[in-house]
Amino acid sequence: MLFESISTLSNLKSASKSSMIASTGSTSSKSSNSIQCYTGCVGGGIFPIRQTSINIDINISISRGCGSCGGCACRY
């Protein structure tokens, strides 16, 4: 599980948006920084996180971030 999560994080930035959507869940509207917002947790998400601030590197890497969209991201 731990190694799987590390692999997911290391591969996240190189993943296309379509593959991220397929592996992570449904999407809602995009933020001003084009960060994809996830409204569903599928495929092993532990719990939903609500993002309230934008730090692109941290949000995308750690929580597949929603930025300012106010949506729900999945922590892995």
Curated annotation (Swiss-Prot):
InterPro entries, alphabetized: HssA/B-related
Record field: compositional bias (Low complexity): 14-33
Record region (Disordered): 1-33
Superkingdom, taxonomy of origin: Eukaryota
Pfam families on file: Coiled (PF05710)
Biased composition regions of type Polar residues, renumbered to the chain: 1-13
Protein name: Protein sigN132
